Regions:
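Alpha-helical transmembrane segments of multi-pass inner-membrane proteins
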Residues: 13-20, 150
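Helix-capping/transition residues at the boundaries of transmembrane alpha-helices
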Residues: 1-3, 44-45
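The feature captures the transmembrane alpha-helix scaffold of multi-pass secondary transporters
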Residues: 34-39
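Membrane-embedded alpha-helical segments of multi-pass membrane proteins
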Residues: 8-16, 57
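Residue-level recognition of membrane-helix boundary sites in multi-pass small-molecule transporters
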Residues: 10, 32-33, 51, 106
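Short acidic/glycine- and proline-prone juxtamembrane loop motifs at membrane-interface regions
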Residues: 2-9, 193
Length: 195
């Protein structure tokens, strides 16, 4: 239990929301909004911040765009889902602000906005853009050694493009989710190995 972190709860909420959004899209967006995904995004936001809304909505939006499912409709649905997901956290944040005042607001801004923008009032695990490109393979050793022959092999770009075109829905979702999360966490200057 000493190794448990709030990041694990955030990951549970985000992964669950991503899968529920994907399932909702696959079923033709029936039954209005994806209420369980919205609840998980709200809980994730209470756990660690708005990233729990941003990433699942971004993954669902990119997947829909790649499938040519209508960018305007998807933009509206994801924006609406994000706004509804903010209701529960907004109530909590309002109560916290009423109790703590500007110190709560400053902490929220410091941990969510300034950390992402690299404008924190203190140095917090600052690493360059390259950090996760090194840490991910290092963290997956010795299995990354098995990937070296694939990386060193001369690639047939036509075959690679064809492979991407023939991906099924689940493969597209998995690839988009992994890439969106990886790229998102590479952006902030504050990076840690636990992310």
């Amino acid at each position: 239990a000493s190794a448990c972190r709030v990041d694990m709860v955030l990951t549970l909420c985000m992964a669950g929301a991503m899968m529920l959004l994907e399932s909702w899209q696959e079923r033709g967006r029936k039954f209005g909004l994806p209420w369980m995904a919205i609840l998980l995004m709200s809980l994730g936001t209470l756990t660690k911040g708005p990233v729990a809304i941003v990433l699942p909505c971004a993954v669902a939006w990119v997947c829909a765009l790649l499938r040519r499912e209508g960018w305007l409709r998807e933009t509206i649905l994801m924006a609406l889902s994000a706004v509804v997901s903010l209701i529960l956290p907004a109530l909590w944040y309002y109560a916290a602000y009423q109790q703590q005042g500007d110190s709560f607001l400053q902490l929220f801004m410091e941990e969510n906005v300034y950390r992402f923008l690299g404008k924190m009032s203190y140095q917090s695990h600052e690493n360059g853009l390259w950090y996760y490109f090194v840490m991910l393979p290092a963290g997956l050793l010795p299995w990354t050694l098995m990937v070296l022959p694939v990386i060193c092999k001369r690639w047939n770009m036509q075959a690679v493009r064809e492979r991407f075109r023939n991906m099924d829905r689940t493969e597209v979702f998995s690839l988009v989710a992994a890439l969106c999360v990886f790229v998102f966490y590479c952006i902030p200057r504050s990076k840690r190995g636990v992310y």
